[in-house]
Amino acid sequence: MFKKGLLALTLVFSLPVFAAEHWIDVRVPEQYQQEHGQGAINIPLKEVKERIATAVPDKNDTVKVYCNAGRQSGQAKDILSEMGYTHVENAGGLKDIAMPKVKG
């Protein structure tokens, strides 16, 4: 019985570790193609409302948005929050994100 309880407790506390995290680059495709964060997907700001549900179907997943300097990603954060996404972070500009970059 103790082992089952310990296993259940371990699983409960490990759930956030497995929560999905999505990085969204809200810049225009040309900028994304020049350089972007590794693993990020490109959804330009003006297309966020139309395309986000396909990229991030679970509104409880963590969504981190970035752009060039943080202004457009701030707008994207507001849009996503209004759409019901619960864990949205404005990660700022490309130079601010702590992830490897992909060029070209």
Q: Regions from the language model: what does each represent?
A:
Residues Y66:
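Short, surface-exposed ligand- or partner-binding patches at beta-edge/loop junctions that are enriched
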